From Swiss-Prot:
Listed InterPro entries: Atg7 (IPR006285), Atg7_N (IPR032197), Atg7_N_1 (IPR042522), Atg7_N_2 (IPR042523), ThiF/MoeB/HesA (IPR045886), ThiF_NAD_FAD-bd (IPR000594), Ubiquitin-activating_enz (IPR035985)
Pfam family for this entry, one: ATG7_N
Source organism of the structure: Gibberella zeae (strain ATCC MYA-4620 / CBS 123657 / FGSC 9075 / NRRL 31084 / PH-1) (Wheat head blight fungus)
Record motif GXGXXG motif, residues: 370-375
Protein name: Ubiquitin-like modifier-activating enzyme ATG7
Name of the gene encoding the protein in the UniProt record: ATG7
Biological role stated in the UniProt entry: E1-like activating enzyme involved in the 2 ubiquitin-like systems required for cytoplasm to vacuole transport (Cvt) and autophagy. Activates ATG12 for its conjugation with ATG5 and ATG8 for its conjugation with phosphatidylethanolamine. Both systems are needed for the ATG8 association to Cvt vesicles and autophagosomes membranes. Autophagy is essential for maintenance of amino acid levels and protein synthesis under nitrogen starvation.
Amino acid sequence: MAKPLQFAPFISEIELPFYSALFASKLDHDKLDDSARSVLGLYEPRSEEPESSCRLQILGNALTSGKTNEPSSPLATMRAEGIIRNVNTLEDFKNTDKPAMLRTAGRQVWDAIKDGSIYSVPSLLSSFIILSYADLKKYKFTYWFAFPALHSDPVWKRSGPAERLTSQETTALVDRVGTWRYSVDARERGFFLAKKVPGRRETDDPDTPQELPFHWEIGSLRDFETGFFDQVPEEDRYVAFTDPSTYPEAPGWPLRNFLILIRHRFRLTKTKVICYRDTWAKRHEAKSVILTIEMDPVENLDITEMPKVTGWARSSNGKLQAQQVNLGEYMDPARLADSSVDLNLKLMKWRIAPNLNLETIKNTKCLLLGAGTLGSYVSRNLMGWGVRKITFVDYGRVSFSNPVRQPLFNFNDCLEGGKPKALRAAEALKEIYPGVDSEGHALSVPMLGHPFTDETKTKEDYQKLEKLINEHDAIFLLMDSRESRWLPTVMGKAAGKIVMNAALGFDSYVVMRHGAETSPEGQTPLGCYFCNDVVAPADSQKDQTLDQQCTVTRPGVAPIASALLVELLTSLLQHPLGKDAPAPQPTSGVIPERDPPDHALGLVPHQIRGYTSTFQQIVIRGQSYDCCSACSPKILNAYRHDGWGFVKRALQEKEYVAELSGLAEVQRRAEEMAAHVDWEEDDDLVDDGEGELI
């Protein structure tokens, strides 16, 4: 008694890059959308080892979203059309109606067979589905493959021994199949018709000796209904499929759905099947198997109802269950860190801030002038936002009082005189995250009110600072003294850079962005750190006691100010006008509206002043001052015109900046006005002559 056909099931073989692609797709594009999307599988004839049988490959580029960008498959590999549904939670994975999901996939194959559209996409006969859940935080992927197979009823059985072709027959067949595959769509290559035709092909060279009494002709499946087998003896007719099975006489999984088509469309109950296992490179080895199969007679060859569908894959232990892979075990630690750093940021775009432009923030090159308390906290917050380029400038060394307040340093950094702060801060950032591009420069920023003693050294520091400012997008002023911020303020504004500033008191802080030279129409330009001064900066360290020389603040003030400063920068970067963004005008009791309304992060204030003594914070909008010692047009024009000559004169001549900016003239006018004030007596304060008012 003939036994029913047995089929070798597909086994999934997933390349590691596919997991990375799925990870990126979920994080950057799909987000909360867990609808099914296309995925491409590939299979091919394999070597004779049973463990390599019926491997369905999922390559790194397998995710497809449409025909325009579908990856092409090599000529020797066959397409399998798949879909993947990557759900949002593990509970969704467990609760998915898997039988219904399989039936839906099976119905797609069945409907294509019924309406004939299968002829355009025969690769649908080898279709598959993937249900998956990607744990983006732990880099674990849970998945379950299904290869929907429509059951034949009655079943097909072998009706004779397996046959094999001769070496000459195989060589001729491989040549014809290869030629045919070049002429058809990639989706048709896995299934075809073959027939033996006596004599030589008309296109063959008549002078070439004919080794076979026949030649092969190959046709697409649709050719069956247009007379491909007309006038061909039954024993010379073959239906064929590319067989990934390596078992001697057990065909691969693609034949199962093909048999439904053979009955319903071809209306056959007996046929010869070529399990095509040959390759061009070894076409003389004759590996293909020919099976003669038949099914019990039936009254009606039409199948009225969709056949039963099975196909959920078994795990390596033979059980019907999902599989899991821990991608973290295979990923390079540096690459793992890259993905993890951006995870929380990209999750913001899923629901909370879909308009957030993370690339703008990531690509902003930041120069931090000062690698102390503010510099440490600012750099960590910048890294939290995904900024990759952070450069430190500081002339100091790590002292024993630093590590408890400055989180980039530790006790060992204080030994042997202390490591240079800027260089050690850059190293610390790389220890935290190797993917950051961080460097440190030990140079002294020339300060107003501090005449130089070594012109060559001071000029070199100035030129190095100028180069660094030109190379970066955002300049952070995080130094200890007021006068050290003056030159970077001038240089940053002259270069058109974003300048961010934070300054601390014992229990207060100011966080601000310096105004740009240009401003939106109808808006007054915003001021800088020095716009409220009535005198030019001078040496603030002279004749000060130790408690005045050190930055004596409540320990929580620096982290608060640093965080606000970085948040202010990111809000500024999200504004369509960038550094030229206007600031809202504070109104008592009124919360300003977002400008523009779709701004991803909200307001972009000019200044934020906070007081920890009262735990209050206020937002201020300050106008630029045309006599400002740092950002007034006279100062900027002089700097642009003379560069180092201007800086040299400002450092050496005490009153130069005040005279040039106009502050000195303002002071003189104020003194003149005070001298001409006519102080009149108030009659209410004059006594009646009986005594003196003390």
